[in-house]
Amino acid sequence: KGCTPAPPRRAPRLGEHTAEVLTEWRNAGSASPDPVGSPPDEAALPLAGVKILDFMWALAGPAATRMLADYGAEVVRVESASKPDPIRGGRPFVDRRFGPETGALFHSTNASKRMLALDLARPEAREVVLDLVRWADVVCESFTPGAMERMGFGYEALREVNPGLVMLSTSLMGQTGPLSTFSGYGNLSAAIVGFHEMTGWPDREASGPYGAYTDYVAPKFAAAAILAALERRRDSGKGVHLDLSQAEASLHFLAPAMLDVFVNAADPTRCGNRDELLAPHGCYPV
């Protein structure tokens, strides 16, 4: 929304654009780009002056804004006063004391941010949100598609308050399409995308990669998309609504297997601890 999507076309062949990329790189010169936020002093971090309102929760969303905060962006994280973030219960815990303020995973994911708890059922809390939207360069959310609209904070509504707003919506399967309302955590999207089918032993059920795999992949794409949108706004003055499917982002890490299927008609299967390229490779008694 807010920009013209690129027309769909086939994937590039190996080396097809190498000469073009090298020519563009050589012609780019050594000039450093201007910062995307307010002009910082020379000692400031590169994203100093960028202001982000963060409605995200769990891991895949907040990890993206944590990266931007580490590079100097000012991030205000809004959490529900009635439904705390579930990763507050994530291990490990400080001094092995279980509690909403002792979970290391939550604090690691939200370091370098300002935190604010609001009850959006209260009119005064909604006014606080709108004030923050006016302040922000970027609004981020990671709810099931439609949740922000039901709260009255969809992109079109927020754009009326802040016309140049960049908004990122990231969810398991994206904002549109037949699976868009399928909500869950990264282990579910890893299974849907195909990581589980390729991980494990050939004579057993699929086991999948450790953890909620796409939760660790998608934040990098989210952070890059936000930076690209800010650069575009600097050049054009226009905001944009970014739609990031965490499942689609993770497909990039299946690219070798997908190319093997489409180009070589291969049938990737689970191979335990073996490696298709290296030998000997495996776990052996010593």
What kind of region is each of these model predictions?
Residues 9-241, 270:
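N-terminal helix-loop segment corresponding to the beta1-alpha1 unit
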Residues 264-286:
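Alpha-helical interface/anchor segments and their boundary "cap" residues
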Residues 217-227, 244-263:
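Active-site-proximal catalytic alpha-helix in oxidoreductases
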Residues 1-6:
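A glycine-rich dinucleotide-binding beta-alpha-beta segment and adjacent secondary-structure elements
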